[in-house]
């Protein structure tokens, strides 16, 4: 049987709009926001996504409280970067905990934990705030990427710790990673009796998350120790 007959006309139209939007997002003829708005407009103009109903299918995403939670978190995270507050927090933890290599790793972990609830991009959090601090600390210790011996001085340990800790903090809050709200919506679609709120997610992840943040740098220190 022809597979196309299993999809109605609106479904095929939506597929065409979706593919076109994805191609535009990849090739970037316009900024991401403009491409997204144009894609939505085309879907509404062609009536692929109607404006009738409550909420209207074309605008249903704007009625999702989780979406607005993520939007607010993006605004706050931009403030961390622009004002330099994120770096100030990182440096404060370094001054308090940075008496050893393990202390530096725990300081970076604490920074990630503080920033995670308001930074829905784990890449931006790690690469935009914490990585520059780790790089500076590594260079101060004479650790560069030129040789394996130099990397093992301090930089390799801190970078490995940064990556592993970032994975932990990304799972601790709904707003710590863009994929988490998708998981919440998927759970709702299954009609489960549990309503996963921001607080419930954070409470459920608190104990395993904090234990992991304490153990990961320590275990890495034992398995992949810096030479300084």
Tell what function each PLM region has:
Residues 26-29, 82, 99, 195:
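Helix-loop interface residues and adjacent transmembrane-helix termini in multi-pass membrane transporters
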Residues 1-10, 93-102, 147-153:
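Short, amphipathic, aromatic/basic-enriched membrane-interface segments that mark the entry/exit
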Residues 23-31, 111-121, 163-174:
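Transmembrane alpha-helix interface/packing and boundary motifs in multi-pass membrane proteins
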Residues 8-17, 102-108, 155-159:
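Short hydrophobic alpha-helical membrane-embedded segments
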């Amino acid at each position: 049987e022809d597979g196309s007959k299993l999809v109605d006309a609106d479904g095929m139209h939506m597929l065409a709009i979706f593919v076109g939007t994805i191609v535009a997002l990849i090739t970037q003829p316009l900024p991401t926001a403009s491409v997204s708005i144009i894609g939505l407009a085309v879907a509404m103009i062609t009536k692929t996504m109607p404006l009738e109903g409550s909420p209207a299918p074309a605008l249903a995403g704007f009625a999702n409280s989780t979406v607005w939670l993520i939007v607010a978190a993006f605004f706050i995270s931009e403030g961390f970067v622009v004002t330099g507050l994120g770096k100030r927090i990182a440096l404060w933890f370094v001054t308090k905990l940075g008496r050893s290599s393990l202390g530096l790793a725990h300081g970076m972990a604490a920074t990630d934990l503080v920033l995670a609830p308001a930074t829905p991009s784990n890449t931006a959090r790690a690469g935009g705030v914490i990585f520059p601090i780790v790089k500076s600390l590594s260079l101060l210790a004479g650790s560069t990427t030129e040789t394996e011996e130099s990397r093992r001085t301090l930089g390799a340990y801190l970078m490995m710790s940064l990556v592993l800790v970032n994975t932990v903090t990304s799972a601790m809050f709904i707003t710590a990673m863009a994929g988490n709200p998708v998981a919440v919506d998927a759970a709702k679609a299954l009609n489960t009796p549990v309503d996963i709120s921001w607080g419930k997610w954070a409470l459920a992840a608190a104990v395993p998350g904090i234990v992991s943040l304490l153990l990961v740098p320590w275990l890495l220190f034992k398995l992949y120790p810096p030479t300084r």
